[in-house]
Amino acid sequence: CKIENAFEVDLAQYTKIVIGASIRYGKHNPLVYEFVKINKDELEKKQTAFFTVNVVARKKEKNKPDTNPYMKKFLEISDWRPNKLAVFAGRIDYPSYRFFDRLIIRFIMFITKGPTDTMQTYEFTDWKKVKQFAKEVF
């Protein structure tokens, strides 16, 4: 479910919990941190997994939990240690972005040597890695 609706979920009824969060403008949604903080006691009683989706992970040296800056920051801020972690690269869908978002993302891609053609969509997700993560979690 969306993070906005997750606060209504009774976590006690589940044996496994998976939380995923994407990066927008260099940050995870603050509600993800709030959710973890409020539910930390319950999360620590369960088998849990966390994954982050960010385009930085398109680079081989930043596509693992221990090398991805956003994962490292999430773990530091949240003070939560899920049983399983994963990092996925996601995609850039320039045509679907608003003008300002497209410019900002294009600039970020330019300075990080990523794709900058705003007429294109770029898929960086390693779907085999996603499927493997799902198998390991479930």
Which residue ranges define each predicted feature?
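Short amphipathic alpha-helix with an adjacent loop that forms part of the alpha/beta core around
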Residues: 7-13
